[in-house]
Amino acid sequence: MKTAHGRIQPVFYWAVGALLVVILAAVLLPTQLEQITATVQQFISSTFGWYYLIAVTLFALVCLFIIISPYGKIKLGKDDDKPEYGYLTWFAMLFSAGMGIGLVFFGAAEPMSHFAINSPTVEEGTIEAARESMRFVFFHYGIHAWGIYAIIAVCLAYFNFRKGKPGLISGTLSPLMNTDGLKGKFIDGFGLVATVTGIVTSLGFGAVQMNGGISFLFDLPINFWIQTIIIVIVTVLFLTSAMTGLNKGIRILSNFNMILALILLMFIATFGSTMFSLNLFTNTLGTYLQTLPELSFRIAPGSPDAREWINDWTIFYWAWWIAWSPYVGTFIARVSRGRTLREFTIAVLIVPSIVGFIWFSFVGGTAMSLELNEVINLSALTNEEMMFGMLSTMPISTITSIVTIVLIAVFFITSADSATFVLGMHSTNGSNNPPNGIKFVWGMVLSVTAIALLYSGGLQAVQNVMIIAAFPFSIILLMMVFSLIKSLRSERSQFSTNQPQLVIRKQSREDEDDSSTTDKD
């Protein structure tokens, strides 16, 4: 099958076939599939939790090594390539694709959960619980999470723009194996299915969460039909954006989102628990950095309750970020041509982590402060309602709540828009500008599937499948890291070989200048 700009690859049909099997099972046998996948997920967490901790920490360490090493000077592209986007637009795009919607949804809910309901180490509802809660939020949304995104993105961008390989996962493994045949197609198909399951579950759960927020504000019911209307509206908007391309749709919406998020953050910082949040940010940043090695390898042997918490939160999050990484990494790589490895890794690893820390400190800090001072019982609300409950204690709460819903919706749109772009790339042999036709097809597949799963109650089962798929994909990620290191070492040796020649040429020019000066004298 051909489109206006390229050929749809067989991996598209294989991925759709595999996806249909999963979706049909989730629609027809949601309870059975959820039970089976939950058991498998629990087995992986209990048996291979140690592996996840080591692997994800390794990804973060490799990113830090790239920042401080001489390899950081290497361009993602030809040596004279210039960045396609300015810093602010580039950062807005990668942040919107990576974690933007999660910060809005869980900015208040996650710190409140650790603080009031399920504290990992101390008594719930205390100031100590507030400090511990924020420390673990920093850990789960900090450099480990962004390290996963950064490592896959840097591999994809390096091999695509500098080595001329297709913008596919298989293209990053060429130094280790021949990926032109079935092996490469299988790897790309696996990444495609992981991307689709991740986006579908996010569309479904996102619709439920938006329904919860609208219900809190306008006293509307929470039901399938309202969620379907939300998905239909979002689909029309993200497909319209997708048809306009990166330089219009996603770029404009991402910039708009960052401005709106900054306005909302400044409002909360002004009318929320300002000093408590500032002190909490400062204190947590110190304890996070101080205890980062311990947190990175904390597995709690011989302590069943602590180990259960680690499985349910830390291991789950590492698997979740890994499962999302094919989509987020591909998109970040696509918009990063012309950057050096160093500036790319700093921008993807450090900057979003700090922004997330600030957001959680003010939003989550204000929520916990309100609960500590008995202003409002936020822990009695659902996750979908906590952000709006917190805003209800501040001036112009109706307006700020509507702004929050708009912010969630636009993050929703940019995520789905980016996803259709990435799926289009993977379906057309890594094309950096996939045709609108294939993006439209994927957009419809995502939306119809999300609606079907909402109707059947199979969303949780598909999310479990996504988390399970993270385990084998983490092995592919490790292979990508070794492949990148091997290729960088080869390139570094070429630089070392060329260096004496540069010195000789420079010395020759100096000798010529000296000779010329002598002649004139």
Label each residue range with its predicted role:
Residues 1-129, 243, 266, 482-492, ...:
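N-terminal alpha-helical transmembrane segments of multi-pass membrane transport
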Residues 18, 51-68, 261-272, 355-365, ...:
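Hydrophobic alpha-helical segments of multi-pass membrane transport proteins
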Residues 4-6, 10-13, 18-27, 60-65, ...:
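Helix-loop-helix module between adjacent transmembrane segments
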Residues 182-186, 190-339, 346, 351-402, ...:
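Membrane-embedded translocation segments of transport machinery
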Residues 2-10, 45-49, 79-97, 133-143, ...:
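Transmembrane-helix boundary/entry motifs in multi-pass membrane transporters
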Residues 1-5, 29-44, 63-82, 133-140, ...:
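Membrane-water interface regions at transmembrane-helix termini and the short interhelical loops
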Residues 499-521:
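Long, low-complexity, intrinsically disordered cytosolic termini of multi-pass membrane proteins
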Residues 2, 35-41, 69-87, 112-135, ...:
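Flexible loop linkers connecting adjacent transmembrane helices
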